[in-house]
């Protein structure tokens, strides 16, 4: 394992902030009342029409553990699998699923390695800003193409990592507007 991969895994297993805090029951109930609302980057919601273009509802949340996006997909009727290398992030999804009576499959995996899924498994792959944490994106895109059904949707968020330093420098903290 590359040192930066281990560093990232350790960070996500130990950090506590808005990105690692699972949604509460009340937050999910509010989200349940409205059309699907998730973000690939901080503060920028994905248009609900994007999800309507999918041929099915089998979704892979790639590197988006934490008990946030996965539960939103589940309450909207998606067949949800979350793959993340952080065991603690996956445990948050499992905790919310159990608390809310949702079905969310969790898989501990590294997106820099082969994905543990059959070819053409998913209708949608949802990958929020996580690609900034890996050096080589080639495997991630090759594997996403392999496990995505023909005509499937690949949604990937990009953000310049400088934003995280800027937020820290200026003392601001993004709120839950990212999901």
Where are the regions that the model predicts?
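A short acidic, Gly/Pro-enriched loop at the edge of an enzyme's catalytic core
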Residues: 112-125
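A short glycine-rich, Lys/Arg-flanked "PGG" loop and its adjoining helix->strand segment in the class I
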Residues: 138-153
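Conserved class I S-adenosyl-L-methionine
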Residues: 153-179
